[in-house]
Amino acid sequence: MHGLVTGQDPRRRRGDLEVKLENPIGFFESDIENTPEVATGMHRFDGGIEFYNAMLKNYTTTDMTADEIHQLGLTEVERLNNEMLKIKEQVGFDGDLQEFFTFIRTDEQFFYPDTDEGAQMYIEDSKKYLAFINERLPDYFGILPKADLVVKRVESFREQDGAAQHYYPGTPDGSRPGIYYAHLSDMTAMPKNEMEAIAYHEGNPGHHMQISIAQELDSVPEFRTQAGFTVYSEGWGLYSEQLAKEMGAYQNPYSDFG
């Protein structure tokens, strides 16, 4: 917020902040002149580069530079494109990869009806995918969560503006289950070919196992059982998507593509 971080007395800064919070619309209207027409990132501020690098380290827990992370991203995009090309050939699609993307995004076979009934079908099929993987978890993991996992549609009061599919933790003692929430206000935004991977990412063996087992640890300080690092949590989610394939999931090649 422009103008708040200054050399002023802390009590005066607090007073300025309280005024701005009491009249947020007025503040934002007056602050428009400090906003560039084109977003240019943190580097335009004093100390911006240092701040950006600190955030990179916070999210990645590494000393990788922005250029190194960008190059890693390009390498991964190339690898994933090659995998997707193989699936395109497997299903016999006659066209390039971009045309295949368009086909999957527009063909009605990949979508449930945009109705409450269609949303319930999405929930039930997600439960089936998780039931399939849950049967195989003991063969791959020596420790399983105490808390059960349930699948729910995001509640109507927060569905319109809420986040996409996400996970909400249960309790460490297992008395309340973890919840995989599916955001289904617009079924055209939730294609069938992506739902299996999302179920494994958010549920098992993904965030439900990752967060639940961490919460249950009694050999570390409690604050460490609640700490979260994006590179680990989302890395585990992506690993879980791949592990599910090794466990026999994605029998439909379109789900593998998703």
Where do the PLM segments sit?
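N-terminal maturation segment of proteins
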Residues: 1-258
